[in-house]
Amino acid sequence: LLAERGLTERDIKVINLDTGSTQAALVSNGVDAAFGGRELFKLRDKGLIDIIYDNPSQDVRYTRQTALVVSSDYEKEHPQNVQKVVDTLVDAAKWSSDEGHAEQVFAEWAKSNDPVESLRADFAGSSLRDKVSPLVDNFLIGRYQAVADQAKAEKLIRRPVTVEGWFAPGYLQAALKSRGLEHYWTPYGPDGKQPAADAVAVATSKQGS
């Protein structure tokens, strides 16, 4: 985001704080500004801070990704358990992707201390189906590689890191196929744009190899 506007980390003084400390620092004027997520909406709604940038164009480069991690040893010893977990997550993603369930989804997520109003604000202008997609597509893999490359460029790590071999999409593909959901979610290319139909087939083939 800084580079997009011709800035570098040397143009600002960066302090690494956890979420709670960041909010406290903002409210007490301990910092001039902060990067954050949906947790900042509740401070804005209380009139405690102003939000000057909120990714209005939904640029996927400024999004966060999450993944389910399993150790290699456990996966080899208990593949059926791994499949059960992935199956359950796919079922949950399918239900959560239905816009008709949006308020129920937000109410459930609000149990983690994110106000429903903040969740609504965070998801404004975007679809639940895209947001909760479980796909391991070229966009997801590309984002992990981009972060690794940036860490090397910023000298946070000494050696380049490749994410090749980090992902095992076989369990996901099995879950999607058994539920007839192979084409329910849209796979995206590295730039976050929907690839052509033939590109999807190539990406799926490579990931499953």
Where are these regions (language model features)?
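Ligand-binding cleft/hinge of the Venus flytrap
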Residues: L1-I12, R44-K46, K111
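Residues that cap or flank secondary-structure elements
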Residues: V14, V31-D32, F139
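Conserved C-terminal helix/tail region of periplasmic/extracytoplasmic solute-binding proteins
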Residues: D149-S209
